[in-house]
């Protein structure tokens, strides 16, 4: 039985749920303005396991992709997917970031 909280089969709901957390939204905002970025737990003042959870949520929602360079992991936005499945989301994130600057 599917419940209202079951987002696993709906990619739009899964992406919106992933983006709704303040830390994950900040990660997305950072990636909107940086083509690729190494994301560390120190940046967000959280433990590594919590950061791993946030990264997994964003990857599972197909909002970000991981690039491995040696032992280093960097992340990029999955822009093609976002523009196709969630048109307007990148513009909302950009608007939010610019609004917070002012």
Where are these regions (language model features)?
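Conserved segment of winged-helix/HTH DNA-binding domains
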Residues: 3, 8, 12, 16, ...
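A cross-family signal for key residues in well-ordered alpha-helices
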Residues: 17, 26-29, 59, 65, ...
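Helix-turn-helix DNA-binding motif, specifically the short coil turn and the N-cap/start of the second
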Residues: 47
